[in-house]
């Protein structure tokens, strides 16, 4: 009998061991590192359209559409549906390590006069309650625990720009933009006794200023310079951080002041830091320097519309070629300080689906392969792996009806998501173009000695590739996609030259070597902004298991935890400014520096600075400069601006909302700069002002 028990135990242990070996590689994803998504694959879900796991919480009446016949109405998707698709392996087998879900807060219940509803989650009513049609707080907690136990982070959408549709002259329009604080009415649009909203009409998108301080369409626009609204929104996001969210996608960042949003990010990073990225929409071919400035200075990353629009032009619409794509890769690497933290995509809820029919499936597969091997944090829009089609909103938000794990796209995502976890070149690497013409793009990602080489042929004919060079070591390399896109094997010689080969029509091949560094290399730092005492995480390779040191320029920081690939430290007590980070191992080996971490001068508040009677000639603008890093440290080249003078105040009064250290004695002056860079300083003594310890403020002076 004992022999039989021993035999059964052996069989059982062998079976358990086999199951453990069979777990997908993505289970290695680190859900505790909430500030680094470089190796992750995000899956964007419009919660109402993904899966209806609990029909009992569906709405009734005019706002619900049975079988989703009316795409403007609720269709039943909920958090239970997402939980089910984690538990049945659909999302984990796909290789997903982060979910971006619709804003979870309570939305308006009323039907818009045009037949629209708040199914999308962007018409907030109460940020401290759940949308009951998605689920209650118990459901949300189960979603978080289920995701985390399966190696998946959860990102929430967040709309601090506006509440819901409203009209100045009609209090019965939808719900009058009303906003509540855990059930208590804060205010509404037509009876705005606390001045919570802007009342400047709708934006015509004619300028950056106009888009910030006027309503986006008919949405009631928050006055973020109002202390009540400022504190309510910051309390609200901290409420959800305490619920365990791992990331935030901020809606409509182009339509809020950078100053207020920087103060928001400071609040988040001082409370519970998580990876945060914003939506700054760019059209096809559009390049906006203000977009790059925001990504570099606000404290958050952005959805990379330059990447998304360009890959669509090359592979979907065929209006651009690989020269254009390579130019985008090259230019954005210079324009974004942390290009690997920008969030890339091929389609989303605000543009038509990439797939347009079965004849385009190959292009979808190819685009996904490029997305998942390029720099940035890749995002898959729900259903793209099933070749869901649809034009613009709402056709691009159809319910997902099939969960087929055998589609080519599903398999490609799964394989490359796994490779992102195991080869640091995809998460952290630089990009080098190796072979290029209108139809062919061969590019190499490199981090230390880890290399991924990807080749794409978007033409309808086979192409002979000669004179290709690579950093891959000598040897034969098989296609990591296992010929799912007709890839081939290559032979690399000792000098890096690749033997000539045929790159098949409409094919993608991926070749790689993973060779983790034994000397320290920093791959990512998150967040890249914080005040003294904040916790940041340094990710990379070769740090060693024994503690060394992390330097901000030459100043050591307090170590919280240390491993070979991840270090957590506290920002040292240094003056506000920009510092280069480096890791020094216990063996006294120093890493290359990671550039320009911004140390804030303290807790941040948003202050509106304004000046009256500042007349200028055409081509001359007004700026502000002062005695802290947030005001440029008296460097005219780093002055804040150009200031605004059209909406909240009109010329010759100028104004600008700026994030400054709280409770700080500030000195500052205004300067005039012309288009040639000539500067005229405001005369007299430095102006002085003490910023508030919390909330917001406005300080106006005369020129």
From Swiss-Prot:
Region listing for D, in residue ranges: 517-600
EC number: 2.4.1.19
Region (A2): 225-428
Binding site for Ca(2+) 2: 161, 212, 221, 255
Renumbered residue ranges of the record's region C: 429-516
Binding site for Ca(2+) 1: 52, 54, 57-58, 76, 78
Protein name per UniProt: Cyclomaltodextrin glucanotransferase
Organism of provenance: Bacillus sp. (strain 1-1)
Taxonomic path: Bacteria, Bacillati, Bacillota, Bacilli, Bacillales
